[in-house]
């Protein structure tokens, strides 16, 4: 099988990822589980050529210099893929993350109504967080798409690499990829403030300068969407503040308390019927109570504020898991494996 056939097989079987690893057969991740494809093991030369042949010259140069590379790749009529090529003890390896050609809507993802409201905010910071593979990009793409279909404006994205491709609908959409189109997230964000955007998507807030620039953009009247790999709203606030030196922390708390619109922390749960996965969300909104807790460095009290803020659209992860179990969408065992307080889900 060549790489196109393997990727077509992967997409047909609704796999989120295709794994190639020298010395082993190809494997796919379906509904969270990694399974072998029933073909012979691939040797180093085969894996290397499969991956090397789809790289551009600059990607090959990066791969040869740094021994690993990230890039995106598209097969027309099938899907786009986010690729990481690397080396391991048996030889070459790569992971292809499937990025569906069709951007799912907020309704198709069963997202709460508040997600649409957040996508139309005139300014502020909206963060979607969670571990790798938790569907952050899918959720953000749906929110950006909702804005694109609803308002007239300019949406600017900075990604590494570009994942979902947005057509300009009501909005003008400009997507920039770190590497071929800009040198870094920080460089693109500096320029962004002079590019007349209404909304900016920052693919990953991975360092101090990027976080600082994203917060500045939100504070100066732009809607900024960003992602972090944190597992809860409280940990997200801690992570942002911890990045800054001690003498800046108070100022950062003040900035964050003014600009934060929401933190959505999500995880994927297996459906009870085994046919797929569904996202469970913790939702913290920038209410006056939450803003005060950020300003006063009382992060530990956020959980109870979220817990009692259901009427405003807030919810803890465990509250959402309880609802998914009650509606027979996920099993109590699955909820227990994802819960902050597992003992709330006996059985």
Predicted regions and their residues:
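Short, flexible helix-loop junctions that flank or precede catalytic/ligand sites
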Residues: 1-347
